[in-house]
């Protein structure tokens, strides 16, 4: 039997990532983005927007994330895609629709394309909870980037399973 695992050491061929970031609740999403960038940079990824390893795509809100993510995934240019957003419960059912559709859309893209898509859309009851998860207590953006690094590495390690 073979054991496959992702690695956090820089690969021989550099990874390419796309980050899809929702502008809505940007107070939160910009902090998540900062956490992602910090993690990627500390793991040898060039996070400069003018560089060749990370592309940044801003969308209006979390509902629009799956559409853009799918376009990126089918392009075949990325080892992993990180989706960042924040959906905060309000007084209407809008939260349920946006959060549910974003989650379903993102999950479908990963399974349909074989490209790791990291679900980094916070779903919280309050802005305070979102801010705690985006930097006050810890920054989930760091964890989303770690997931992307591990999955990109794992998919490369498993590539021989789909060849020839």
From Swiss-Prot:
GO biological process: riboflavin biosynthetic process
EC number: 2.5.1.78
Keyword Iron carried by entry: no
Binding of (2S)-2-hydroxy-3-oxobutyl phosphate, residues: 91-92, 133
Pathway note: Cofactor biosynthesis; riboflavin biosynthesis; riboflavin from 2-hydroxy-3-oxobutyl phosphate and 5-amino-6-(D-ribitylamino)uracil: step 1/2
Keywords linked to the UniProt accession: Riboflavin biosynthesis, Transferase
Catalytic machinery residues: 94
UniProt-listed Gene3D superfamilies: Lumazine/riboflavin synthase
Methyltransferase in keyword set: no
Pfam entry (one): DMRL_synthase
Catalytic activity: (2S)-2-hydroxy-3-oxobutyl phosphate + 5-amino-6-(D-ribitylamino)uracil = 6,7-dimethyl-8-(1-D-ribityl)lumazine + phosphate + 2 H2O + H(+)
Annotated residues for binding of 5-amino-6-(D-ribitylamino)uracil: 24, 62-64, 86-88, 119
Molecular functions per Gene Ontology: 6,7-dimethyl-8-ribityllumazine synthase activity
Domain of life (superkingdom): Bacteria
GO cellular component term of the entry, any: cytoplasm
Broad EC category: transferase
Family membership: Belongs to the DMRL synthase family.
Function of the protein: Catalyzes the formation of 6,7-dimethyl-8-ribityllumazine by condensation of 5-amino-6-(D-ribitylamino)uracil with 3,4-dihydroxy-2-butanone 4-phosphate. This is the penultimate step in the biosynthesis of riboflavin.
HAMAP family according to UniProt: Lumazine_synth (MF_00178)
Record-given protein name: 6,7-dimethyl-8-ribityllumazine synthase
């Amino acid at each position: 039997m073979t054991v496959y695992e992702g690695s956090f050491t820089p690969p021989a061929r550099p990874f390419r990532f796309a980050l899809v970031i929702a502008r809505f609740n940007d107070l939160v999403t910009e902090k998540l983005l900062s956490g992602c960038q910090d993690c990627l940079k500390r793991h040898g990824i060039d996070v400069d927007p003018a560089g060749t390893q990370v592309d940044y795509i801003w969308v209006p809100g979390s509902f629009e994330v799956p559409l853009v993510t799918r376009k990126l995934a089918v392009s075949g240019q990325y080892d992993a895609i990180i989706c960042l957003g924040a959906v905060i419960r309000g007084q209407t059912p809008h939260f349920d629709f946006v959060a549910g559709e974003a989650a379903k859309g993102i999950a479908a893209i990963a399974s349909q394309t074989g490209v790791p898509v990291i679900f980094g859309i916070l779903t919280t009851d309050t802005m305070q909870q979102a801010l705690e998860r985006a930097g006050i207590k810890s920054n989930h953006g760091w964890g989303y980037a770690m997931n992307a690094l591990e999955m990109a590495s794992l998919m490369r390690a498993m590539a021989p399973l789909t060849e020839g």
